[in-house]
Regions:
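N-terminal membrane-proximal hinge/A-helix region immediately C-terminal to the signal-anchor transmembrane segment
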Residues: 2-158, 163-166, 170, 191-202, ...
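Cytochrome P450 heme-thiolate "Cys pocket" and heme-binding signature region
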Residues: 350, 467-500, 524-526
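Conserved cytochrome P450 K-helix/beta-meander segment immediately N-terminal to the heme-binding cysteine loop
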Residues: 441-471
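Central I-helix of cytochrome P450 enzymes
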Residues: 223, 227, 231-232, 285, ...
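Conserved cytochrome P450 catalytic core segment spanning the I/J/K helices
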Residues: 180-181, 282-359, 392-397, 420, ...
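Conserved cytochrome P450 K-helix E-x-x-R motif and the immediately C-terminal K′/meander segment
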Residues: 91-112, 291, 295, 387-429, ...
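Cytochrome P450 catalytic-domain helical core, especially the substrate-recognition surface
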Residues: 64-105, 123, 149-232, 244-299, ...
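Cytochrome P450 heme-binding "Cys pocket" and the immediately downstream C-terminal segment
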Residues: 370-372, 439, 494-530, 534
């Protein structure tokens, strides 16, 4: 690995892990830069307003809020050293309706890796510097979830995803032991593989008649089924039937995002939540999710009590029901049903959303790069020999893992992390922040910065090829933070990676796929990066997989 990089511009920035010149692919993912490429469906933005038409509203502040932020900073003798971005409506008119994190990247190129942005009723310090991100994420006592907790409490309640202080410490300590190695091994065989195989079975009809399929939708169904079985031992069966939970989760997450930039937090007024259509829709969505989780908890609790089950070993797995819910109930921890519901709801939402997005964008990137796709399928064929993957196979699927990590670099989930300063602090670079200051850590900016990554806008899986541990925030010095970092790093990172590797291995082993031409692949956000209109592909059964399966059965 090369020496640590400076974020100061250099004549020839080096990649974090040097790609092989002969094997590295050179396609460009969905990004601001590729929107003008002829016949390229990877444009990152929705179409702009028509000439002469009314200007759409924006999450970004009007000019007067930017001016006010700049005036207040100057008038108070700010001294923070943080430049104020000119967030004019015209600057983002071509991005409206698309991905909200893309304007942040545009302004980073103009103002540098840290700047102040007036957005709605607040001003944010936007960070695209790994050293500053490391400082904020590691100093948990100085920086809290803040705004994130405020706007998503209606969904997560007191769940560990947004809890603070002693409650967060206690809940994380209770949940983490359930994600042990033996549990993950069981999930690979009994959940991840089987759900992926059910997806392949579902797609066989489309493979025979050539019907285009929305792979984003299919991956969302797959991951909901997987998270249902792994967390609750319950099959949502969304691959074969419509699931109201998927729509409810997406509606709730979009509401949380909207609340973060509302000019007035009217959703704090209870009676308004009963009459405003957007709030009515959000409350109905949360009710669907909570009712589902509460019923599953009650059913499992009844079984555990009737059997008198207790955990008798560190890596405990109930053979009939290896779910996280069963582990938590069998641990006999004194916790209210409400708290347990909120904790498990956090896992349901985060686990479903994140992995579905990882699968969607990795498949998209592979569909645009024949060389990497061929290399990934050859590796899968060599390692698996026509059989389903096992837990022991995962470490052998090195190139496929590189593809997933590179997808996470280009399309991080979430693309932005938000923290709030609880005390006065001085950031690396001598930038000063006051108590109450909201900070946006733009993971997207860090992952796309040409000062951090060589060929930053290109899909180069080989940059992550290493014989050592998988890349993470620690061994990349916070240049790669797909699962956040510090004490509040995602507890399910290994779970998400294993599920992604297994699902893609099964899919690549059994199916060929091509992107439907002339479709516009644009981005929007919930908690993760979604496509605006789906990811449509045509699939076919692989003859290689059938031959290998036949050979291995002899």
């Amino acid at each position: 690995m090369p020496a640590p990089l400076s974020l100061r511009p250099s004549p020839s920035p080096l990649p974090l892990l040097a790609p092989s010149p002969r094997n590295a692919s050179s396609i460009r993912p969905c990004s601001v830069r590729c929107s003008a490429e002829k016949n390229d469906s990877s444009s990152s933005s929705a179409e702009g307003p028509k000439p002469g038409g009314p200007k759409p509203s924006s999450w970004v502040s009007p000019d007067w809020l930017t001016s006010l932020a700049r005036s207040l900073a100057a008038g108070a003798g700010d001294g923070s050293g943080i430049p104020v971005a000119s967030a004019k409506l015209d600057d983002v008119s071509d991005l409206l309706g698309g991905a909200l994190f893309l304007p942040l990247f545009k302004w980073m190129k103009e103002y540098g890796p840290i700047y102040r942005l007036a957005a709605g009723p607040r001003n944010f310090v936007v960070v695209g510097d790994p050293a500053i991100a490391k400082h904020v994420l590691r100093n948990y006592g100085r920086y809290a979830k803040g705004l994130v907790a405020e706007v998503s409490e209606f969904l997560f309640g007191s769940g560990f995803a947004i809890a603070e202080g002693p409650l967060w410490t206690a809940r994380r300590r209770a949940v983490v032991p359930s994600l042990h190695k033996k549990y993950l091994s069981v999930m690979v065989d009994r959940v991840f593989c089987r759900c992926a195989e059910r997806l392949v079975e579902k797609l066989q009809a489309a493979a025979l008649d050539g019907t285009a399929v929305n792979m984003e939708e299919n991956f969302s169904q797959l991951t909901l089924d997987a998270i249902g079985l792994s967390v609750f031992n319950y099959n949502f069966d969304s691959l074969t039937a419509d699931s109201p939970v998927i729509d409810a989760v997406y509606t709730a997450l979009k509401e949380a995002e909207a609340r973060s930039t509302d000019l007035l937090p009217y959703w704090k007024v209870n009676f308004l939540c009963k009459i405003v259509p957007r709030q009515i829709k959000a409350e109905k969505a949360v009710a669907v999710i909570r009712k589902t989780v509460e019923e599953l908890i009650a059913k499992c609790k009844e079984i555990v009590e009737s059997e008198g089950e207790r955990i008798d070993q560190e890596e405990y797995v109930n053979d009939a029901d290896p779910s996280i819910l069963r582990f938590l109930l069998a641990s006999r921890e004194e916790v209210s049903s409400l708290q347990l519901r909120d904790d498990l709801l956090s896992m349901l939402v985060a686990g479903h959303e994140t992995t579905a997005s990882v699968l969607t964008w990795t498949l998209y990137l592979l569909s645009k790069d024949d060389s990497s796709l061929k290399k990934a399928q050859e590796e899968v064929d060599r390692v698996l020999q026509g059989r389903p993957p096992t837990y022991e196979d995962i470490k052998k699927l090195k190139f496929l893992t590189c593809c997933i990590n590179e997808s996470l670099r280009l399309y991080p989930h979430p693309p932005v992390l938000i923290r709030r300063a609880m005390v006065s602090d001085v950031l690396p670079g001598n930038y000063k922040v006051d108590p109450g200051q909201d900070i946006m850590i733009s993971v997207y900016n860090i992952h796309h910065s040409p000062q951090v990554w060589e060929r930053a806008e290109e899909f180069v899986p080989e940059r992550f090829y290493t014989e050592g541990p998988l890349p993470n925030e620690t061994n990349t010095d916070f240049r790669f933070i797909p699962f956040s970092g510090g004490p509040r790093k995602c507890v399910g990172d290994q779970f998400a990676m294993l599920e992604s590797i297994v699902a893609l291995a099964v899919f690549l082993e059994r199916m060929n796929f091509v992107l439907v031409p002339d479709q516009k692949i644009s981005m929007t956000t919930g908690a993760t990066i979604h496509t605006t209109n789906g990811l449509y592909m045509r699939v076919s059964l692989r003859q290689t997989a059938q031959a290998l399966a036949s050979t291995s059965s002899r």
